Every structure is written in structure tokens, then in C-alpha cells.
Amino acid sequence: MGPVSTSRRGLRLGISLILLQVGVVGACTVSVLQPGYLEVDYTSQTVTMECTFSTTGCPAVQPKSLWFRCGTHQPEALCLDGCRNEADKFTVKETLDQNRVSLTVNRLSPNDSAIYICGIAFPNEPVPTAKQTGDGTTLVVRERLFSREVHSLLIVLLALLAVYVTGVCVIFIVLFRSKSNTPRSRETKEDSKKKSARRIFQEIAQELYHKRYVETSHQPEQDGNYENRKALPSPGRP
């Protein structure tokens, strides 16, 4: 942060010298505000940087706005002629009654990356505070990494990937539910088989018990008949 702040101070000193040429140093206070950073894609074609200011103790006259660009070279004054034509590289729009000015960079290219500084000056005021600059807006113009065709293709691929992932999730859920239901069905079948086997076993046991009961009930009757036959005299014997 040290070297950057030092370089910016040097830039502001150099720009202040340019502002001093606009009017004699001498009575009001101006404060200038700018966004510190702005990053755009060069395919945007245009970019606008805003600058707002406030005044204290200054006369009721319109101040003069100036723009400077600081790149790899010395500070460069922009739009000294006003830059009112939108066909130009730079276009300045002033709304001084609202304390607002803006600079639009047309036909963007990566070479437009620089620090753009807004300056507001009351030329007829003798004090240095009547001529002030903002801290500057660092504009970064990025080259587009992909063409429109590649960008569209990536969107389509992402959509297909989303559909594929959704389908896989649905299949996984269905398989998981079917597997969780299979053991239950198997248990139900095994339980029914066990119940039917128990029922058959009980029926066989009841049948055997019934037969045994019938046999045991007939056995005393047969024994009684046999004894009665022995007790009876045989015919033909005196």
C-alpha cells in the first residue's frame, strides 16, 4: 500500500499543477468523490465513471470539470474541448446543478485500463482548496475469455449436466426405495410360509391325536368283548 499511495500522491500533485493553470490560486473548499475500482468486459463497448463533488463557501457560479488519465505514462488531460460528441472516444456529461459529472469511455479495449481522475475547479478563486481532484477510479478492462459461441455451448453443457445429475438422483432414490422394500416382501413371504407350515403341522398333530384317541377308545371295548366271550359257556358242553 505504501508505493501505491505515494504514487497517487505524486499524481495528485502533478494534476494540481495543471489545475493551477486553469485559475489563479486563491477562497472556497471543494471535495470530490469517485468510486475506487471498476472492472468491466471490453465487449460492453462503453463504460461510465461517475464523479460527485460538494462545495463550501464557493461563489454561486458553475465550476469547471476536468478529467485526467494516469496509465503507464504521465498524467494525460482528457476532453479539454468538452467531449460532447458521443462519436468521440470520451464523452463528458455535466450536471453541475446536482454536483455531478461523468466520463464515458466509448469503444472499450484492454488499453483503456488506467486510473481516471476527476477534477473540479473554480478558476477565479485564489485558494488551493477551490481546485481539487478525487482519488481516482481504477478502470480494469478485461479481455473476454470465451467467445459467444463457446459461452452458449457452456450454458447448454451446464444445463445438460444439471438434467443428468437430476436423473441420476431420481434413479438412485427409486433403487434405494425398491431395495428397502424387497427385504420386507421377503420377510412377509417367509412369515406366510412359516405360518402355513405351522398350520399344517398342527393339523397333522391333531389328526394323529384324533386317530390315537379313537384307537385307545376302541381297545377297551374289544377287551371287554373278549372277556365276555370267555365267560360264556361254549355250546355242546354239559
From Swiss-Prot:
Gene3D superfamilies according to UniProt: Immunoglobulins
Cellular localisation: Membrane
PROSITE patterns: IG_LIKE
Chain positions covered by the region annotation Disordered: 215-238
Regions crossing the membrane: 154-174
Bias (Basic and acidic residues) ranges: 215-230
Disulfide cross-links: C51-C118
Cellular component GO terms, alphabetical: membrane
InterPro entries, per the entry: Ig-like_dom, Ig-like_dom_sf, Ig-like_fold, Ig_sub, Ig_V-set, IGSF6
UniProt keyword terms in alphabetical order: Disulfide bond, Immunoglobulin domain, Membrane, Signal, Transmembrane, Transmembrane helix
Span of domain Ig-like C2-type: 30-134
Membrane topology listed for this record: Single-pass type I membrane protein
Tree of life domain: Eukaryota
Principal location listed in the UniProt entry: membrane
Topological domain spans for side Cytoplasmic: 175-238
Region forming the signal peptide: 1-27
Other notes: This gene is coded entirely within the intron of Mettl9 which is transcribed in the opposite strand of the DNA.
Protein name from the UniProt record: Immunoglobulin superfamily member 6
The species this protein was found in: Rattus norvegicus (Rat)
Gene: Igsf6
